[in-house]
């Protein structure tokens, strides 16, 4: 209880993350297997993954209230993803397509589209601690059994097979990406509740280029409430080619190659100019351990990530984008100037670098929990 003269606690900033949710099965290996080879992993972890999902987890770890809009569905895999998200403090708007065989909890007409995260008190309780322990791989056997027992089409969720090389932290990923069909209706219902004043509006909206039908609803909501929209552009996706021009800030990887008059663009400055010409007000290009580059409003800059001994780089880009969203939450389009964007990129680089020092996409949160702007 607050002391009589103490001010009420400030509300956590809200971030809406629209895109992809998958199941990441992560193996730590001495070296990737050769063709027709079998190897024994050094460690294993299973966690919910996907660009928007990992960004939402990062936003929550940094003290924000994260809401993820993604198709999850029903079945053992979906149950596992829900448990992981709840343990990480992420609320879910399940945007899976309804069917008789895989009905989501809010189908057909659940009044409240948000599936709650665990509260801070619950996360500190023994039961939640046991759940988090299993999700972080200490008790991964039960989680792995859920994957192995799931019918192949039970939920439509994709499984990403991820290997991480112990000596370098480099990762390799195989995934079918957005296999589950997306239904925008639950997200539209949330947007209507925001418009009616029944739900808190987001202070920022992030899209990841997957499930463009959800991106369209998220971007429309951002425009209506007057908050920034951020795109994790990752690598180039043909079906998301029109999205960068609809976003205020676009963060792309060094493998984002938009089409140009003479072929694919690869030089960072050419890519940045393409993004700005398309309509973005700020552009960021991440390059792993090399300096992240940013451009906006006639300004530009470079931020060198902290030097760390990388153990696992899986999800570092997603975590960067979640931290970037946390740094920009509450800003408006006119605020995208050099000092603001540069500072947000610098903070995001620090968080992403810290995430690579531990194996898996969850353990790093203990080091930065609650470290907001």
Give short role names for the model-derived ranges:
Residues 57, 159-163, 172, 291-294:
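Short beta-strand scaffold segments in enzyme catalytic cores
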Residues 84, 88-98, 149-153:
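A glycine-rich helix N-cap at a beta->alpha junction
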Residues 97, 151-154, 160-204, 209:
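Conserved phosphate-binding/catalytic loop of the ribokinase/pfkB sugar-kinase fold
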